[in-house]
């Protein structure tokens, strides 16, 4: 059996860290949505008991360091699976960008393996299992738009956001998520209005969504990396209705209602930034094919 499945990127419409927990993680409130920038995974069931990864990108490990490998190994051990799998990963999501590319790949792998290994697990069971690998993976298992709480693994579904344009720009730098959280001072930052964001999404109010965007991690990343702030400022100068860093960065995204204005923002970032994308909110159409 072979299956092909997409792994869409995510953006944080709002990201709040409330306090640091005893386990070392921060208690978070994040409103996230998937977008139509996506990796593609092709999975083939093997009779031989082995996990084979083939990543069509440089600098990405194909062994136990890869979240996809960890996801496959976890399912094999949990359910005593004696079959193997070959997974080909066609990368389109920028790496180390704050867009959950690795987490989305792992989520797609869990869903694909559930099918080709005939495990019969529910989406809720897959999400629960995923929390053993990483905090963002549970959201990626569900996809769409949702509120993530706890350390990010508790998911409450929300309606999809209204149609709009999203321009992404990633500078040629990398940031360390653990370092950003370590330097975050939750008592000294402006916190986003998560409640207002959720209310705006529920009634389909794009202006309310734009006005409610916020990310407490900007207080650290923008201070350490001025080029990230310059991208955000440039997006607003070219007509973005909202601009925000996704996750711990360094990718910044702009939200725009009209295509013509989005194109202007996109063109204004090309040449200024190495990786620029113009996308839409994710649609579930053509998510997976089975042969």
Swiss-Prot record:
Binding positions for ATP per the UniProt entry: 94-104
List the pathway annotation: Isoprenoid biosynthesis; isopentenyl diphosphate biosynthesis via DXP pathway; isopentenyl diphosphate from 1-deoxy-D-xylulose 5-phosphate: step 3/6
Which processes are annotated in GO (biological process)?
A: isopentenyl diphosphate biosynthetic process, methylerythritol 4-phosphate pathway; terpenoid biosynthetic process
Please give the Gene Ontology molecular function terms for this protein: 4-(cytidine 5'-diphospho)-2-C-methyl-D-erythritol kinase activity; ATP binding
Which superkingdom does the taxonomy of this entry point to? Bacteria
Q: Which UniProt keywords apply?
A: ATP-binding, Isoprene biosynthesis, Kinase, Nucleotide-binding, Transferase
Q: Name one Pfam family in it.
A: GHMP_kinases_N
Residues at the catalytic site: 10, 136
Keyword Ribosomal protein present in the record's keywords: the answer is no
Q: Please list the reactions this protein catalyses.
A: 4-CDP-2-C-methyl-D-erythritol + ATP = 4-CDP-2-C-methyl-D-erythritol 2-phosphate + ADP + H(+)
Function, as annotated: Catalyzes the phosphorylation of the position 2 hydroxy group of 4-diphosphocytidyl-2C-methyl-D-erythritol.
Which NCBIfam families does this one have? ispE, PRK14608.1
Its family remark reads: Belongs to the GHMP kinase family. IspE subfamily.
Protein name in the entry: 4-diphosphocytidyl-2-C-methyl-D-erythritol kinase
What gene is it encoded by?
ispE
